[in-house]
Design a protein with these regions (language model features):
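Conserved helicase RecA-like core
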Residues: 1-187, 195-197
Length: 198
C-alpha cells in the first residue's frame, strides 16, 4: 500500500448564502410533556401549515394518534404508510386542507411545499445534516420561516448544541407558559468556583 504525502483533509461547512431566512428556537420540557408542549405551541402561535419530524416511525404514528385524539387535524408519513394513503395525505397538505403533517426523515424525502409556516423537531435529529434538511422545508420562496426543537432530556440538548455549532446557527431557547405566551429563556451563568483559603 502506498501513502501519499500530499493528501489533505477537506471539511465542507454550510455557506451563509445557502441558508434560508429561518428563526430558530428551542423549548425544554420533560419527556412526558413533549406532546402537550408541542400541541400548545401549535395552537397558541396560530401556525397554518406545520411539518413535525420524529426520528422513528413508531413515534411518528404515536404522536399523530395523540394529536388526533386531542382534536388536531393531522396525518403522518412513515415507512408503513401505503402509497395510496401517502398520496391522499400529501394532496391534502399541499392544498392547505391539512394543517399538520408528522413525518420521519425518510418518508419526507421528495416533499416540495413552499409555504410551510413552521417546522418542529419533535425529536432532535441524530445527524447534523438532517437538521439542515428538516428546517429547510420552511423559509422557502423568500418567505420567513420558523423552526422549533423540543428538548426532552440532556442528550437532546447536547445534540442540538452540537448542531448549532456545526451549522453556525443561533437557536434561541424559549419558555412557553401554560396560556401559550412565549418568552426568552434566561440563561443562568454557572456559579463561580469556591475559593479555598488556607
Amino acid at each position: 500500500m502506498l501513502f501519499r504525502s500530499d493528501e489533505v483533509e477537506i471539511t465542507v461547512e454550510p455557506k451563509q448564502e445557502d441558508k434560508p431566512d429561518i428563526d430558530q428556537f428551542s423549548l425544554t420540557c420533560t419527556p412526558l410533556e413533549k406532546a402537550e408542549t408541542t400541541l400548545r405551541l401549535i395552537k397558541s402561535q396560530g401556525y397554518e401549515r406545520v411539518m413535525i419530524f420524529c426520528n422513528t416511525k413508531h413515534m411518528c404514528q404515536r404522536l399523530c394518534d395523540d394529536f388526533q385524539r386531542a382534536g388536531l387535524d393531522c396525518e403522518c408519513l412513515h415507512g408503513d404508510i401505503r402509497q395510496q394513503q401517502r398520496e391522499k395525505t400529501m394532496q391534502r397538505y399541499r392544498s392547505g386542507k391539512l394543517p399538520v403533517l408528522v413525518a420521519t426523515d425518510v418518508a419526507s424525502r421528495g416533499i416540495d411545499v413552499d409555504d410551510v409556516d413552521c417546522v418542529i423537531n419533535y425529536d432532535v435529529p441524530e445527524e447534523n445534516e438532517y437538521y439542515v434538511h428538516r428546517i429547510g422545508r420552511t423559509g422557502r420562496a423568500k418567505r420567513k420561516g420558523v423552526a422549533w426543537s423540543i428538548i426532552g432530556n440532556f442528550p437532546e440538548k447536547a445534540k442540538l448544541d452540537e448542531i448549532a455549532k456545526f451549522s453556525n446557527y443561533t437557536i434561541q431557547p424559549m419558555v412557553l407558559s401554560p396560556d401559550g405566551q412565549l418568552t426568552k429563556e434566561e440563561v443562568k451563568a454557572p456559579p463561580a468556583p469556591k475559593r479555598r483559603f488556607r
